[in-house]
Amino acid sequence: MGKQKRSENTYTKINTIFFRDENNIIMPYDEFVAPEFEWLRNCKFDADEKIDGTNIRIEVTRQVEDNAIVWSVVFKGKTDKATITTKLDKYLKETFTEDKILNALGLSKKMIILDENGNATQEMKDKKWVNIDNGELTNEFDISRVPEMYTLYGEGYGAGIQSGGYYREDVAFIGFDVKVDDMYLLRVQRDDIFNKLGVDIVPYIGQFTIDEAIEFVKKGFNSKIAKKEHLAEGLVLRTPMELKNRRGERIIFKVKTCDWNKYFNKYGTYDKVEQIKNKFLK
C-alpha cells in the first residue's frame, strides 16, 4: 500500500534534518537538508518527545444558520481517507464528547449572533467577533473575525497501534498542536486548551540547539510516558515563536532514535564514515 495523499488540513509534514546515503542511512555529519537549519544551528529549539502512534485530528468547523453560528466536531486520521481503528474511535468519541471539546475552546454548539435589537450579542462582543472602531468594540457583528476551523492535533497510541504496546495496555490520545484556521497556537495557548479538555500533552523535554538535540538522541533517552521502560522514539523540535522559512513553511524537524540505531548497526560506529548521498531520499 502506497503513501496516502495528504489532505488539505493534514498535519505539517515533519522531516528529519539529515540527508540519507545509498543504504537509506542518515548522513549526520554532512550538510543539513535545508539551509535555514545551518543559520539556526546555535539557536535554542523547544523539544518534545516523539510518540509512536497514529495521527489524529479533531476538527471543529463553523456554519452560519439564520441568526446563529453552529459548530460541529469530527474525528479524522492523518488524511481524510485514513481509517481510525474501532477501539480508538470508540475511545475518542466516548472520552471527548462534542460538549467537552467546545467548552475547552470557549464555544457552545449554537451561538446567537444578534439580539432582538439587531445588535451583536454580548457573547459576540466577548469573543471580539464584532467590528472595532478606534479600538472600541461596536455593535456590528463581523463574520470575518470568526474562525472557520479549530483543529486539535494529537497521536492515538497504545496497545495495537504501531509498536506502542510499551506505552500502555489500552489506547489513548495525546495532544501536540492546536491550529486556528491556518495559525498554530503557541505552547502556552495550546496547553491551556488541552488542559481544559483533559488531554495529556506530549512530554516537553527541554530546549536544545540542533547539535545538542542530535547528541541527546544519539545517546538515547527513555520515554517519559511509557509504562514499561523503553527508549523514546526521538525528539520533535520547533522554534519557540513558531518561525517559518522563506517558503512559508513551519520550521519543525525530528531526530529519531531508530536512525542512529540503523547507523550504528550498518557501520559499527557512531563516528563519521564515508557515505554516498542518495539523490532520492532524505
Residue ranges and their predicted role:
Residues 1-282:
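Core nucleotide-handling region used for phosphoryl-transfer chemistry
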